[in-house]
Amino acid sequence: MVRKAAQEPKDDTLQMKVRQYVVSAARLPIEQGTKPEILQMRVFARDEVHAKTKFWYNMRKLNKIKRSQGRILSVNEIYEKSLNTVKTYGIVLKYQSRTAIHNMYKEYRDVSLNGAVSQLIQDMAGNHRAQPDTIQIIRTATLEPKDIKRPATLAMRNAALKFPIVKTIHRPSEKKYRTVYKATRPTTF
């Protein structure tokens, strides 16, 4: 049985369910009595198993530590405090294409960092055919309005931004006028 996270949205959107974990591990001691250094890393993954796998992949690349040379101490999920305001996130990443490794910087608007990362994964899959396993997130940041670079997010920078109502939905003024079955077809134009 799969356990649901507290921040998982209630509606079934098309976004990939991405969670943020802090994985802590220690190198196995070579000699008796020595204290091994503790290594920590923030990882975006679907679940704890994928988080551990991504952690060991990065440790092999960065610190030259294999899974057999260390042990995982803890895997903790990070929950964001406020999901009420839309923020702009800047994400630095690298991904493996069929020919080479590419570095990228992308900006997304979302209420949570997990949502921005899931947008990133879908965007990379659609535009670059990159699988989620080939994407390595290097750095994330919440951007101030003056730090926004990309035109798609620059258009949303205005605080007094308004959207036109393209389609009006006629609703009954009071609850007593609301019915389950109508005698005529509704007009939606």
From Swiss-Prot:
Keyword terms of this UniProt record: Cytoplasm, Ribonucleoprotein, Ribosomal protein
Q: Mind listing the GO biological process terms from this record?
A: translation
Quote a single Gene Ontology cellular component term.
ribonucleoprotein complex
Question: Sorted alphabetically, which PANTHER family does this protein's record hold?
Answer: 60S RIBOSOMAL PROTEIN L18A
List, alphabetically, the InterPro entries matched: Ribosomal_eL20 (IPR028877), Ribosomal_eL20_dom (IPR023573), Ribosomal_eL20_eukaryotes (IPR021138)
**Main subcellular location:** cytoplasm
Query: What protein name does the entry list?
Result: Large ribosomal subunit protein eL20
Subcellular localization(s) per the UniProt record: Cytoplasm
